[in-house]
Amino acid sequence: MSTGFFGDITKIKYEGPDSTNPLAFRHYNPDEVVMGKRMEDHLRFAVAYWHTFVWPGTDPFGGNTFERPWFKDSMEAAKLKADVAFEFFQLLGTPYYCFHDADARPEGASFAENTKNLNEIVDYFAQKQADTGVKLLWGTANMFSHRRYMSGAATNPDPDVFAFAAATVKTCLDATQKLGGENYVLWGGREGYETLLNTDLKQELDHMGRFLNMVVEYKHKIGFKGAILIEPKPQEPSKHQYDYDVATVYGFLKTYGLEKEVKVNIEQGHAILAGHTFEHELALANALGIFGSIDMNRNDYQSGWDTDQFPNNVPEMALAYYQVLQAGGFTSGGTNFDSKLRRQSIDPADLLIGHIGGMDCCARGLKAAAKMVEDKALSGPLANRYAGWNSDGAKAMLASGTLESIAARVEGENINPQPVSGQQELLENVVNRYV
């Protein structure tokens, strides 16, 4: 049953690359087979509940620009928001969604009231999922917006805040389990510091490590089969976050014995804030064995802020999905649009148009990436570049060589290697042929 919020807009369909209809897909065809798999199953698109249905269009200099009929702190409004959300998922044809607890439920006066409200809306979500076939990609807890978390959640100097956060994660893991969620995400927006003058760095890291171990212990206790994911970000809102980037997260996981239990959810915009490319973070996560899922968006390259815009750069998407394919594709993860409208885009149709453009961009990137994989456009030159390491001598040097034995061989065989071109320009031109 229609809520009426989207007027007379009907289900978004694939019309092909020649279509000029803004409410149609030009490149995303869910049933198109790419490398032996349906496009929908490769991309596993999800809609972010928070940016799509909760964000009011504020900025540091101005208030709400979006007028939504569910912008009230009541259970009735929460259920209307859910009605509109699931109608949106069906119009768009996205198979998944993601949410924080605070996105979905009214804010209560106590932990018990929050839990009661969450349980009620989770039951409502469960019925919506049964009615529509839409599934939960991942759930998470908002432990950064409420003022109690201004000094962190797991890293807060107040043990009562740590306890409140731990209890909140328990309820959110329970909710994710009940809804059949395929992952559970932790993003530490306040797990960091503003100044070292009032921060015990080691204690906060130790507390965060213990907190995450508790999450993993509870996951196994309740039989949750999904992945636990950390989402790296270098700063914003904290001056310095402890989950700065993939490399930092991996070091943290190794320190606290969690590298086999926890993976990463990598966001395009966060990678850029950390001074990396998206594909760098994806490639590193794959190399370290912790690749899990992605949040798709883009930043404004001039402002330096985490602007969470919809992706529209096909070459960037091609290189990103190339790394996803190199990792074997998604297992429990997917492509969550952690993207929001610009505050001047106030029409309901804008919500659909933003996602349509992002989905088309990702589809084009996936197809280009798949063709590069099939043609060995990059893997062939890469194999040639490292071919010397396939020789018996090179393998023996790594396996049993010492500095003394290697030095003796270099001198005895008069080894004098000459540089070989890295062919970066050629490879960049190759990529451009596919995008």
From Swiss-Prot:
E.C. number: 5.3.1.5
Entry-linked Gene3D superfamilies: Divalent-metal-dependent TIM barrel enzymes
Principal location class: cytoplasm
GO molecular function, a single term: magnesium ion binding
Co-factor note (free text): Binds 2 magnesium ions per subunit.
Localization: Cytoplasm
Highest taxon of source: Bacteria
Annotated residues for binding of Mg(2+): 306, 308
Disulfide bonds: none
Assigned keywords, A-Z: Carbohydrate metabolism, Cytoplasm, Isomerase, Magnesium, Metal-binding, Xylose metabolism
GO cellular component: cytoplasm
UniProt record similarity statement: Belongs to the xylose isomerase family.
Protein name listed in UniProt: Xylose isomerase
Source organism per UniProt: Allorhizobium ampelinum (strain ATCC BAA-846 / DSM 112012 / S4) (Agrobacterium vitis (strain S4))
